Amino acid sequence: MDSPCQPQALNQALPQLPGSVSESLEPSRARMGVESYLPCPLLPSYHRSGASGEASAGNGTPRTTATATTTTASPLREGFGGQDGGELWPLQSEGAAALVTKECQRLAAQGARPEAPKRKWAKDGGDAPSPSKRPWARQENQEAKGESGVGCDSGGGSSNSTTHSSGEASSRLREEAQPSAPERLALDYIVPCMRYYGICVKDNFLGAVLGGRVLAEVEALKWGGRLRDGQLVSQRAIPPRSIRGDQIAWVEGHEPGCRSIGALMAHVDAVIRHCAGRLGNYVINGRTKAMVACYPGNGLGYVRHVDNPHGDGRCITCIYYLNQNWDVKVHGGLLQIFPEGRPVVANIEPLFDRLLIFWSDRRNPHEVKPAYATRYAITVWYFDAKERAAARDKYQLASGQKGVQVPVSQPATPT
């Protein structure tokens, strides 16, 4: 057993959704990294027909709306519910990832207009602060009043110096009032997406330079023989390699040759820290070490599973991908998430510099499709303090397991 933070395969008590469609979309039909669809029934309440009352097959030929007469149905194709055949509502059978990646230009270019999650004002029961004047705005008003009486003051020099010092104070207050980049990302994007979808995708998380350094360190771990076959928590008669085919290493981020991985974790910590208190009743006080994972490209994947099916304390899963020029039609390795109770599948391409966040519990069963090229990812799980403490008491975690949790890094104190 590597760690208590190894994802455990789904047991038979969980409902098994139908398998994915093997048919791939044509290049002209592919969008947002969605290469295949889960054959599942459509919900009439989610789809509004277009003016013609029929959905187009993407080539101008009308077709009737698909109905679920069996447990499997034809895969949805381009044009159905959101292109020329009607409006696609959030989480229609197309993949949550396609709808939560707000920055993607391909989605906007092809006419889909999903309903984006929006924050509510505090007075309406949301978490967004009520609009009010910032401290620097009040300071500027005071300055304006002071300047109106300067002409009547015989001590012009002292008034100018006072105004100058007030201006500096105003600038300082303005800088303090403006939210940081991680805070804006957390409050304006990640928190609404997690509440609305339970899944969040953020592209260009670190940027090409730092992301490239992280990739170089991960490749060095692989070629240095630091990776070991991933293990399962439960003792099963099934060979582990038939369930998961990755090789892993646990990294804290301060080891020699892992500084950039540590920087990645600090960036993720900063975002999650700003999400704390806004994602339900979770009290996030720590996380696991970073799990560096590599699928060697020999056609292995990871069967459908839930990261935390039995309440071991993990509440949020964060995965950072490092695969440049990845093409799922050629390389495979697609991550599929099957949100519980919804007839949808989120198809996530493991693209370079992409951060994926989702709930770790039974709400998000997921699997990694077989990979035919070297596939890298770094995963970290964040703990809910109450559930983690209960798990320690219930399962009497071994000493090796207790040592896995590390505190969420704090921002450096400015000097």
Curated annotation (Swiss-Prot):
Q: What are the entry keywords?
A: Dioxygenase, Iron, Metal-binding, Nucleus, Oxidoreductase, Phosphoprotein, Ubl conjugation, Vitamin C
Query: Where does it reside?
Result: Nucleus
Gene Ontology process terms (BP): cell redox homeostasis; cellular response to hypoxia; peptidyl-proline hydroxylation to 4-hydroxy-L-proline; positive regulation of protein catabolic process; regulation of neuron apoptotic process; response to hypoxia
Q: Which stretches does the entry tag as region Beta(2)beta(3) 'finger-like' loop?
A: 233-243
Task: Provide the binding site for 2-oxoglutarate.
Answer: 375
Q: Which terms does the record give in the GO molecular function aspect?
A: 2-oxoglutarate-dependent dioxygenase activity; ferrous iron binding; hypoxia-inducible factor-proline dioxygenase activity; L-ascorbic acid binding; oxygen sensor activity; peptidyl-proline 4-dioxygenase activity
Q: What are its cofactors?
A: Fe(2+); L-ascorbate
Q: Which residues carry this modification: Phosphoserine?
A: 130
Q: Compositionally biased, Gly residues: which spans?
A: 148-158
Tissues/organs with expression: Expressed in heart, kidney, brain, liver, skeletal muscle, lung and spleen. Highest level in testis.
Per the UniProt record, which EC number(s) apply here?
Answer: 1.14.11.-, 1.14.11.29
SUBUNIT field? Interacts with E3 ligase SIAH2. Interacts with LIMD1, WTIP and AJUBA.
Q: What name does UniProt use for this protein? A: Prolyl hydroxylase EGLN2
Q: Name its species.
A: Rattus norvegicus
